Amino acid sequence: MLFLTKDLELIRKQLYEGVNLKMSDLSVEDLLDDINTDVMTPAWVCFDHEPSVIAENAYAGLLHEGRRVFEPRALKDGGFEVIVSGHRKGTGSSRETAPQCERWSGIRIVIAESFAPIHERNNLNLGQLMGDHSMLERLQDGERIPLTEFTEGYDPISKLILESGGILPFAKRLKSGEVTLPANDCGPRPMNMIEKMISSKLLGRGDEPGFVKPGDAVLAQVDGGYSHEFTTAQVHTFLSDEYGDDYALPKPSKFAVFEDHLLYATGVARFSRFESKIQTLRDMQVDFQRHTGVRDYSAVGGISPGICHQVAREEFIDVGDFIQATDSHTCMGGASNALSYGVGSTEYANLVHNQFSFVSVPESIRFKLVGELHPGCTAKDIILHILWKFAANSETLDRSMEFGGPGLASLSMDERATLCNLATECSAKTGICEPDDRTVEWLLDRRRDLTESQIRSRFVLPDEDAHYDGGTHEINLLDIRPMVAHPGNPDEGVPSDPTNGAYIDELGDVRIDIAYAGSCTAGKDDDFSFYAMVCEAALKAGLKVAEDVDCYIQFGSKSVKDLSERKGWTRIFEEAGVHLIDPGCGACIGAGPVSYTHLTLPTSIQV
């Protein structure tokens, strides 16, 4: 057993000097709290896709006096089967590599006082048993604890997944008839949008209508999804390992791969030692696409067709769809009245192969929009208001954010996409907009295979007396003012957090060095019309980008770039001194383009 103590030197002694500890000699307060997934597997570790290789650098981000506490292979070669920590294990990024580094190092039981929800789910999908410190003391006293004690706190389906050893072995048992799904006993009730969407996808019900309520654990049929080059290699590996090298996908036509995250990483100085691994990730995505026949959105001539979330909503997310993808901003699809959110690589491997996903029906919070925004205000200001007034109080936490009301009709589809995209910054499960005439018009403009009647027939609207655990909150758009997310001050304990909102007119003059516009949130048609409006006004006033400021604008997709050229916006940007960047996610994750590597801007999404 390995105890992750606040005394980091004591961890070293366990790893390298054979020191054995007992829980009875410690208290929970002696153990590390809030172990971040970036500590368990820093970003550079994620360039490896084989979990066994990832495990060689387990906890590479845990440093003491500038030196790694866990040297390479320390956990893997330590012979540990149980790992122990304090409160909130697995905070931060939802990366699945974090629990993978433990599982493939031989860890079979993870003990903590509490777990971050997504990290707990990732452990569950891998079949990792989780317990508390009282169970650990019993184990150390020689007691045998039955599996049922490790699973008793979970819903019936999660129990089956754990007992099966993870989501992929569970899917095999389900298909063979070795296990059966417990009946969902929810009777008829008024439902909100996410409840209706989930109830219409319940596995095994056919055309029979179903009902769900918050907290219900169900399996739901997935309509489509996508992955990108940072995650596809693992998906391909997991499916090959589980089903053999000749595995096939039953319905590849509505699944896709995108080359957008690492497109510009080659040449970035800090990634130079990982170039071969990055290329392997790219190559394996190509192999996966050719093997499965999913939609191919690879770069052509070094230029990506677009950022995955933008292209997906343009080309294949339909009203009422259930879409899952390996990225947290997948919820952008909710603008099209679809249910969409991000999942880990193992979950995605299961759903793309078996066409179902585990769903714990979330609670919902409704935002009723009234009035219209003032000129100069956008949907970004609405979501920053929600972050400040609601998310900061955890009112949106793990809930579905439902947007409706007469004010929604005044927002374009691109502005609605901004609202839904940023639901993840509110720590929400997803965001969903009510459909209307604008939904129909926007989709018909982009899909020759759809008709108005087909689109309207799939509309999902809440029942009039639907219940919202988070309440219904009216937001008068006339009250919204331009805002920014405060950059924070780590020296004073103020995090860089989008809930730290500030009104622009109260900031005074703030000197800037870099201006960036783009990302999945802000690289859409309407966003570019806003940028062009500002740049054109500047040019008319005899102004350009200041000499000591670098200004970048990045297209969200090829179609956005084409529109910019047709409208003359590209010429306006160039005359104003803006640097234009082809589509990609590099700026948000610090992965290039090479001349713009200082653009490590999560604020491109949040602000």
Residue spans of the language-model regions?
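N-terminal, positively charged, Ser/Thr/Ala/Gly-biased leader segments
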Residues: 1-46, 183-208, 220, 224-228
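Long, structured ligand/cofactor-binding scaffold of large enzymes
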Residues: 38, 43-48, 52-53, 57, ...
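Glycine/serine-rich anion-binding loops at beta->alpha junctions
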Residues: 81-103, 312-340, 513-526
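Acidic, glycine-rich flexible loop/linker segments
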Residues: 117-188
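Glycine-rich ThDP/TPP pyrophosphate-binding loop and its adjacent helix/strand module
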Residues: 169-172, 176-177, 374-375, 385, ...
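Accessory "access/gating" subregions that flank catalytic or transport cores
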Residues: 306-315, 320, 426-545, 553-566, ...
